[in-house]
Amino acid sequence: MYKYTDDKGQLKCSFCGKLQDQVKKLVAGPGVYICDECIELCNEIIEEELSEDLNLEMGELPKPKEIREILDQYVISQDQAKKALAVAVYNHYKRINLGMKMDDVELQKSNIIMLGPTGSGKTLLAQTLAKILNVPFAIADATSLTEAGYVGEDVENILLKLIQAADYDVEKAEKGIVYIDEIDKIARKSENPSITRDVSGEGVQQALLKILEGTIASVPPQGGRKHPHQEFIQLDTTNILFICGGAFDGLDKIIKNRISQKTMGFGAEIRGKNDVQVGDILKQVLPVDLLKYGLIPEFVGRLPVIVTLDALDETALIRVLTEPRNALVKQYQKLFEMDGVTLEFKEDALVTIAREAIKRETGARGLRAILEEIMLDVMYEIPSRNNISKCIITKDVVLRKEEPLLLTVERKKKKEETA
């Protein structure tokens, strides 16, 4: 049996055997003692093992094709965007694993800017990428940001969200992904630099520059504004991947104007105004168009990878409802299954839901709201009735012309007997 004291009755560490007066602190547990030196050694061992787990080894890092295949399971359509994101993310983490500086080449960070209408899958793509790579992920809204000294959030609060997502593990957070939404809302209000202060536009772009490029940021652990008597978390943003997204309404007109200037004159191809879809126009975006939109040159320069997304058409929205692993129809069917009920959506119902989302101009994001409106009453009713076997949603249910068709157990039995 282990003795916790020496011959003189002095307490000692159960692990290294050092006496109480030979160490700074001796912590008591149920039938055991541990000194501060052993605690420190244990912490070092744990940190070392965790840091090894954090490093995405080249063998473990998914290849661009593998990343694209996993994205396909969650995000419908947007093939070109998925390909571009897969390559950009692969190169980013390859750069981290191999070290930023080679003998002859310095690899720079490839932050991403995503352009696409509301509900086209920008946020979902960024979330899924973080899930694939098993890295911390944070979402921030650019509209809530202001430059330092004004009412609103400091840009450092974005980094705090990432640290919180990493359970305050700074090393883990330093390899995470940050998605900044509504980035188009911080565009400069006019093309010419303003004399007055634009605290939520150009000022925020200036404030974001350093963290996008890579800096040691001082992050207030409780959020809010900085004050001098506060302790800060030091976070290196060099290896954090920033993905900025926005709808950029009106950008297509800027691109059109640039293209039309080149296609004027003899021999120019004559095309109708509505011949080209907005998504096809956005694919021709250049950094100069983003500058004209109101982003400052330094900001555009720190987002070298430009990815464009298409508006989802009726066919794509129906696929969003039914195909992904987390498809809304599958989710509702699972919820009904838990109550012992089979849920069926008729094809015409899915088409009507998709058309309603297009009419509302909400894209895939609006599908959930439409389904909630349709399903609320029946989801309220079914748990209280134990004789329902099936619920059928038709086009007329979506259009509010009739109630969902509920089949009872008795009706089901009768059908089986007549068959």
Curated annotation (Swiss-Prot):
Keywords: ATP-binding, Chaperone, Metal-binding, Nucleotide-binding, Zinc. PROSITE patterns: CLPX_ZB. Transmembrane segments: none annotated. CDD domains: RecA-like_ClpX. It comes from the Bacteria. Residues 1-54 form the ClpX-type ZB domain. GO terms for cellular component: HslUV protease complex. InterPro entries: AAA+_ATPase, ATP-dep_Clp_protease_ClpX, ATPase_AAA_core, Clp_ATPase_C, Clp_protease_ATP-bd_su_ClpX, ClpX_bact, P-loop_NTPase, Znf_CppX_C4. The keyword Hydrolase does not apply. GO terms for molecular function: ATP binding; ATP hydrolysis activity; ATP-dependent protein folding chaperone; protein dimerization activity; unfolded protein binding; zinc ion binding. One of its GO terms (biological process) is cell division. ATP binds at P117, T118, G119, S120, G121, K122, T123, L124. Gene3D superfamilies: 1.10.8.60, ClpX chaperone, C4-type zinc finger domain (6.20.220.10), P-loop containing nucleotide triphosphate hydrolases (3.40.50.300). SUPFAM superfamilies: Glucocorticoid receptor-like (DNA-binding domain) (SSF57716), P-loop containing nucleoside triphosphate hydrolases (SSF52540). Zn(2+) binds at C13, C16, C35, C38. It holds the Pfam family zf-C4_ClpX. Component of the ClpX-ClpP complex. Forms a hexameric ring that, in the presence of ATP, binds to fourteen ClpP subunits assembled into a disk-like structure with a central cavity, resembling the structure of eukaryotic proteasomes. HAMAP family: ClpX (MF_00175). Belongs to the ClpX chaperone family. ATP-dependent specificity component of the Clp protease. It directs the protease to specific substrates. Can perform chaperone functions in the absence of ClpP. This is ATP-dependent Clp protease ATP-binding subunit ClpX.
